[in-house]
Design a protein with these regions (language model features):
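Extended, non-catalytic subsegments within catalytic or DNA/protein-binding/adaptor domains
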Residues: 1-177
Length: 177
């Protein structure tokens, strides 16, 4: 079967990360954004910086979040698609990006958690009734952000954040671990 229909990548190219970054920079200052915009920006920045699946992003919990001046670290204890016996808990790191606060996932997340959603939090959903966010909801939000940025969502889905962010990082010489 492998030789009859060998696996192929979904995309032969990826979207330009600069288009999305320019769009996300325009959503600043955070204090003037509607909750839905802030939610979309936070989700997009966390997805870009972490390059994680939407399932992993939906498993992030402020109960297992440690934030310092240098960044935010999440410990993911949930069973994920990539989980296997003997493997330790997944750590998701969001380093601070003081060079450009408009694109800093760490500071955007902290503002979202501490300033905008503290009073309504049962989860990080942006519309009533504020319920737990599923991986499908996160993937849909990421697709909405791509669409708003002018990226063709008939080709690219929320999962494309993983490939686009890592491709951009490699092209800039950022080490991936």
């Amino acid at each position: 079967m492998f030789h009859i229909r060998p696996p192929e990548p979904r995309y032969s190219f990826t979207w330009d990360g600069n288009v999305l970054l320019t769009f996300l920079e325009s959503w600043f200052p955070l204090s003037v954004l509607e909750l839905k915009q802030l939610t979309l920006k936070t989700a997009a920045l966390v997805a870009l910086v972490s390059a994680q699946r939407s399932q992993t992003l939906s498993a992030l919990s402020i109960d297992f979040m440690n934030s310092t001046a240098t960044g935010t670290l999440f410990v993911v204890n949930s069973l994920l698609k990539s989980s296997r016996p003997g493997k330790s808990s997944l750590m998701v790191s969001l380093p601070a990006f003081p060079e450009n606060e408009k694109l800093c996932a760490h500071s955007t997340l902290l503002y979202y958690v501490a300033s905008r959603t503290a009073s309504i939090r049962q989860s990080l959903n942006s519309s009533q009734p504020y319920k737990v966010v599923s991986s499908a909801t996160l993937a849909r939000w990421l697709k909405v952000v791509l669409s708003l940025a002018g990226i063709d969502t008939s080709i690219f889905k929320g999962h494309s954040f993983r490939g686009a962010s890592t491709s951009k990082a490699v092209s800039l010489g950022v080490p991936l671990d």
